[in-house]
């Protein structure tokens, strides 16, 4: 298995905030616009067909049997991996970046999780249970879930090897090694608040109330498991830009003139927890 940094660490580059600017566009009459739209529609339909083909191949991946027993903590008590399915045969699991040393969940993961409440019943009707898993103790997770107003199931792997076995988390000494010859780990862990405002991705670490190494030790991952004849199998997993499928706001922003407006390379520093946005600016 790889030990390279993946996930949030790949695309977090902390910002200097600026006013969003509307790009210049050619102005045409409705007939010319319709012609241009129809040209784009051909490409969109091709992409849809390719996406359907890819989804079929994704479903056709071989299954990996999970032979080790894992027990995670939930608000209702300890649960085995099989029990997390809640009587269904398919389990979608989002590894939410919230380590034991965090005081709050990752802002990017929080923005993703905002969409989970609304899909739970729809997924249950399709024989799918959706759950988040983090390494923070269950008490921290429950308190944060109440703050955010979420009701999806959330399990703690605090005293389990689960995250490490599946590389949803990385040992701190491994993370420190990523900075050898670049930024000494001891300096990263002693960033001043001012340095944390501009260091990449120290701002998100500071937002979580933790140090950079502890922040990067957690990896956002979307995984799928199935339960068949009492055995649990992993059928799919993705991270980094593969997570955009659950970042619903991106699908909407990709269709407005200003787009994601994150620059090059992509800089998602605008993301906040939903109770932290400047409401006057939002209006």
What is each stretch, according to the model?
Residues 2-91, 96-126, 143-149, 153, ...:
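Non-globular targeting/processing and membrane-anchoring segments
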Residues 124-141:
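Catalytic nucleophile loop
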Residues 134, 156-158:
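Residues at the C-termini of beta-strands that transition into short coil/loop
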